[in-house]
Amino acid sequence: MLGRKKNPETVQTESKSVESKTHDPLRRLGVLDDEDVLLMLQGSKMMKVRSQRWRKDRRLKLLEDCVTVWCESSKTSRKSNRQQTFSVTEVECVREGCQSECLRRMTDLVPEKNCFTVVFRGGRKSLDLCCHTQEEAERWVRGIRTLKDRVSNMSQKEKLDHWIRGYLRRADQNQDGKMSYDEVKHLLQLINIDLNEQYARTLFKKCDRSCDGRLDHVEIEEFCREMMRRPELDAVFRHYSGNGCVLTTLELRDFLGDQGEDASLVHAKSLIQTFELNDWAQKNLFMTQNGFTMYMLSKENDVFNPDHTHVYQDMSKPLAHYYISSSHNTYLTKDQVTSASSTEPYIRALNQGCRCVELDCWDGDKGEPIIYHGHTLTSKVLFKEVIETIAQYAFKASPYPLILSLENHCSVEQQAIMAQQLQSILGKKLLAKPLSDLPLKQLPSPEELKGRILLKGKKLNGLLGKTESWTSFTNSSDEESVAGGNKKESKKDLARSASTKLSPELSDLVVYCQSVPFSGFETANQRPPSVITSFSENEALKLIKDSGKLFVRNNSRQLSRIYPSAQRLQSSNFDPQDMWNAGCQMVALNFQTPGEQMDLNQGRFLPNGRCGYVLKPEFLCDPKSDFDPENTGGGPGHIPTQLTIRVISAQQLPKINTDKPNSIVDPQVWVEIHGVSIDKARAKTQRIDNNGFNPRWDCTVSFQLQLPELALVRFMVEDHDHKSKNDFIGQFTLPFTSLRTGYRHVHLLKADGSTLSPATLFIHVKVVRRGVHIKTVSERIGKA
């Protein structure tokens, strides 16, 4: 006998158990009866496509957590295992048909209606797939979109619940629906916590009501509730609650007043109606501890001001009065020497709200202009394909004007082709003539240019005199040097660039962003507002140091674009804050390179609905401003402010070293101020050993700010390491002017800017301006 026949009742019970495991996440996501999601759970065979030569049959299947999609592969390495799955939370969008660069080149080899592309956030490559039927492709597209929308609309508490249940399934190694003590220890390792052995056993025994040495479904839930208790949050609740059990509307109103929010009874009642889960409490207008936790973890209580999540600033000012989200070498996927040129980075940048993208244009074969990093090993992409991509995605994330920064190295003939392609593809979106025939006194506003695409480039019959008008002059202050500063060819190439003629057709399309070299501020003041000058980072820093006031005044009426040094061959970035301090509008960064500089950029453009335009402080918009970014001991914008932040705790920080199951993070938190030089500062908490699940610091840091309007606040969490460099865990950056006071949660982001949900920091923020502080209710009745 090879094996014992299972009892039919046992088989039926196991079948129901498996079914219920799948139904739980379906029910929580509200997709229990969704036929598209049910198809995904069954799995489908389809073709994975990378090129015309690389096409492999794969089976894709949605796993039981209803968030993870598994792609069958014969590879067995740990890295490949990670790449075999993706979470719908990592998906930026799903594109139907042959919309990717790869699939567009294969329309004669694959049926377009059977294809779709999964585009991920961050640096992960897109996934091109071809199903056997059109219906199957449509159902997978709908299914992924449905799950993506449902997960993004979950409350923070629901996300935590879903997160912990996913780990429970992984920890239940024999999949019997119960957990032994060893499986519980495995769970603790998975969720990044190293509990004291005695405490873990005590907690296990406390929850083991059946006393059989294994936790069933109900007991596991109790164990998780105990694990996820937030004593620091409970303390805040008890402080405001008269009886320690519920908050009345009056008590909740007092709490809201201390938070610096709308402290009305109407607002307090609306929060109870929204976040209270208990029917009796909701009916009687009480908020229980669970309801309070739901509220505290919600976006309503986020550290970032929710009023700033939509366009709230005046968009009728001249373009020069705004910071403009700008990308450098937009076409590159990685470094400036060997990486691929592609349309994908344009899509990513535009979807992030970028409003100025760069096109490095060169003569291509067969009369077709191309885009690549000249005289390097980077691959090439057709100019036409890039413009088609821009036409499709230009205004998906923002309705405000998009600027195309042309680095023009093409012959007159191919420039004419560029002009024709720009007009035929972009159509009415392309601004080809001024909005008014009247002489230009100031640049038009983002509101006036809504939905329009502007060209930044050289112009004939411009400002350099008629005898010079047929030449596209190039110098280090106006155009980026070719090939990132290749010395062997730079003299020859620059000489050739200096005599490159400009096509009248292309010149005519340049309206409000005419590129001119910098010839001093006296000359700049005599030029119209429609000119723009590009500076390398080093040139800009020198101007800020030597002529800061003049630079600020110039930037109040004309646009300036700052680009990274040619020596940054790995596409690294400079600190954009110094340029923003001087009022520079277009501080172009390598969007393909994550890091602190891109964190700052994301934080700078987080407010105003992430539309890519943020109004500069008034003292940077005044043509007679006396503001000097290098000397900020007083003067315009000077508002002495004390910022005090208490870093209380963190929740659900992820494991960093996933290759080592026993590795648990030792987190510490940095709080950084990025602003004018006198305000720049950082402070850190102590580290907490072996606890990424619910570390607690209760550490207070304080900063003295002189120009709060220019300051960014960055929270960064890292894994402390004695032997090597600390590992980055997550961060969140926002303008000081968008920072909310009181008890707040900081929802952390990954290095690529995507969400690290459900990881959060719990903090308390206090702001005192000009030495005057109005005491909160808590401070009047006693310290919390």
From Swiss-Prot:
Give the note describing cofactor binding and stoichiometry. Answer: Binds 5 Ca(2+) ions per subunit. Two of the Ca(2+) ions are bound to the C2 domain.
**Binding-site residues, Ca(2+) 2:** 208, 210, 212, 214, 219
Stretches assigned to the PI-PLC X-box domain = 313-458
UniProt keyword list:
Calcium, Cytoplasm, Hydrolase, Lipid degradation, Lipid metabolism, Membrane, Metal-binding, Phosphoprotein, Repeat, Transducer
Localization recorded for this chain is: Membrane; Cytoplasm; Cleavage furrow
Which positions in this protein are listed as binding substrate?
456, 458, 534, 561
Q: Where do the segments described as Substrate binding lie?
A: 48-78
- What cofactors does this protein use? Ca(2+)
The residues that the entry says bind Ca(2+) 5 are: 719, 721
Binding of Ca(2+) 4 occurs at 664, 666, 690
By its UniProt entry, which InterPro entries does this protein fall under?
C2_dom (IPR000008), C2_domain_sf (IPR035892), EF-hand-dom_pair (IPR011992), EF_Hand_1_Ca_BS (IPR018247), EF_hand_dom (IPR002048), PH-like_dom_sf (IPR011993), PH_domain (IPR001849), PI-PLC_fam (IPR001192)
Domain EF-hand, first and last residues per copy: 159-194, 195-230, 227-262
Name-wise, this protein is 1-phosphatidylinositol 4,5-bisphosphate phosphodiesterase delta-3-A
Q: Which organism is it from?
A: Danio rerio (Zebrafish)
